[in-house]
Amino acid sequence: MTGPVMRAVGITQFGGPDVLEIVERPVPEPGDGEVRIRVAAATVNPTDTALRSGRFRAPDGVEPPYVPGMELAGTVDAAPAESVFRPGDRVMAITSARTARGGAQAELVVVPADSVVAVPDGISLVAAATLPMNGLTARIALDLLALGPGQTLAVTGAAGAVGGYTIQLAKVAGLRVIADALPKDSELVRILGADVVVPRGQEVAAAIRLATGDGADGLVDAAVIGQEVLPAVRDGGHVIAVRTYRGETERSIKVTTAWVGDYLRARDKLADLARLAAAGWLTLRVARTLPAEFVAQAHALLEAGGVRGRLVLTF
């Protein structure tokens, strides 16, 4: 390898957390309309554990090591003259791990300018890193549902990062929210804004239906329950599957998968999320910070379950 190099999290083979390592990669050069960011913080998400384990196929045409990560925050390192950003600006961004450049978990990352927004004053870079991917996943889910004020939204996996943002964005939109929670998470989910909290578990669909009468108008399945959640939704309602959907449908219920990749360059959407976070409408939850060298521990913690908020790697 010639030229300047940087540190990055690398997946050289598929397997458990122990396959993760810190590797050297060439420093990426920004092209037209791109920004290079010196990463301060990048989150660990289920998409990263899926890539590492081989549950997600390897990126097409990309040789290992694969660099995971889809959301980050840091400072601008280089930007084109016509950009609104200048070196040193505090920013957050969403990116993809499915390119030759790799994902967010590296010292320096190049992304399209349309994937970057400023971090508002008063929000730390560690906290800001938890917003782009998870917040935009919640945003696209609600955009697909297109429910109006007063309608009822159900949320599974409500205590998680996507679920929490979904609740808070739904309340901004004037929706009535019914959300699931384990007993230890019930108070958290209420604080996030749920109007009704039902027990999480095998009977969650029945509990939601009981709370609504004839079922919710729409449901965001952040817990990835699949077909078993359909009884929670009214006839002709709409279910948004986060990441994947298992099963058939029934009673004219529409099922749509929310792909955050559709919002990779939705700068206006991300800027609106940043504005809501600065105003206190969105809660940025950091479960724990770890140096990038402890990425294997972060994966193990995430896969053990029970993480509330996001695990954040620091560089």
Where are these regions (language model features)?
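NAD(P)H dinucleotide-binding glycine-rich loop of Rossmann-like/cofactor-binding domains
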Residues: G61, I94-A154
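Glycine-rich beta-strand-centered segment in the early N-terminal region that forms part
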Residues: P26-T43, F56-A97
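Glycine-rich phosphate-binding loop and adjacent beta-alpha segment
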Residues: V224-L282, A292, F315
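Short amphipathic alpha-helix with an adjacent loop that forms part of the alpha/beta core around
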Residues: E203-G213
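Mid-domain Rossmann-like dinucleotide-binding core that forms the NAD(H)/NADP(H) cofactor-binding site
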Residues: L131-R200
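C-terminal hydrophobic helical "lid"/dimerization subdomain
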Residues: M1-P4, K269-F315
